[in-house]
């Protein structure tokens, strides 16, 4: 009896969260729902994919890469086909990432996209706040060991404070994926920046691009 009561309480909480206007709360609830009811989760996914919210659509696509459901594969295949036309660029990396999850080749996929010149997959759709945390605190990437941002960090590599004024998104992405392709004036080979695909997931790369593409004036400690 207690178990049924707890399940009913959880279902009620999920229902409220799924219908909340906060996209992040909705996505979190959808992922919880998928753990117990994949069919209902698929119904929500299909609805979310028709929404204007990029966050909700990204969350739905991410879930497609984890569900053990033939319908999830079908929808994901359709989304992949739409990448050649109407699918917003901000969702392209999410589709690739969801597909890659099924074959466990996510980073190899991003490298392949880069090699093919498909920079657009990680150009837009990132989260600037997550990107800020990655740039400042990711242990393996260690951006601030060499770069300075808003007066914090090293000086052996270009200052990233106003990177958005010097580089467009494609150049920012290239500097992460292929850092030795363009050497900043005055630094030569001293930077010796490692290729970040060794340390970052595709989504993290996209978040960093989004962060660096923003004006730094609103970046507060």
Model-derived regions, located:
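Electrostatic cytochrome c docking/interface patches
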Residues: 111-138, 216-221
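Conserved hydrophobic register position within alpha-solenoid helical repeats
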Residues: 29, 60, 92-95
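Amphipathic alpha-helical scaffolding segments comprising HEAT/armadillo-like alpha-solenoid repeats
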Residues: 5-17, 27, 38-50, 58, ...
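The canonical Cys-X-X-Cys-His
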Residues: 131, 139-150, 160, 193, ...
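Alpha-helix N-cap/helix-start positions at coil->helix boundaries
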Residues: 22-24, 54-55, 85-89
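Axial heme c-ligation environment in periplasmic c-type cytochrome domains
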Residues: 80-83, 90-99, 154-163, 179-206
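Detector for the c-type heme attachment site
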Residues: 136, 145-152, 165, 177, ...
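Alpha-solenoid repeat junctions
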Residues: 3-7, 33-37, 64-68, 84, ...
């Amino acid at each position: 009896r207690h178990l049924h009561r707890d399940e009913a309480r959880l279902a009620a909480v999920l229902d409220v969260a799924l219908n909340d206007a906060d996209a992040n709360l909705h996505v979190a609830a959808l992922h919880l729902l998928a753990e117990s009811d994949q069919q209902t989760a698929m119904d929500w996914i299909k609805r979310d994919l028709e929404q204007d919210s990029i966050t909700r659509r990204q969350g739905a696509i991410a879930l497609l890469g984890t569900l053990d459901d033939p319908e999830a594969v079908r929808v994901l295949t359709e989304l992949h086909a739409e990448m050649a036309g109407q699918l917003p660029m901000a969702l392209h990396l999410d589709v690739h990432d969801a597909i890659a999850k099924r074959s466990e080749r996510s980073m190899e996929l991003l490298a392949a996209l880069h090699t093919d010149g498909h920079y657009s997959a990680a150009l837009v759709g990132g989260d600037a706040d997550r990107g800020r945390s990655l740039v400042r605190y990711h242990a393996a990437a260690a951006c601030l060991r060499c770069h300075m941002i808003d007066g914090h960090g090293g000086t052996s590599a270009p200052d990233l404070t106003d990177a958005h004024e010097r580089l467009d998104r494609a150049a920012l992405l290239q500097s992460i994926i292929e850092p030795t392709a363009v050497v900043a004036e005055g630094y030569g080979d001293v930077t010796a920046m490692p290729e970040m695909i060794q340390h970052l997931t595709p989504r993290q790369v996209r978040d960093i691009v989004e962060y660096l593409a923003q004006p730094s004036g609103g970046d507060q400690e």
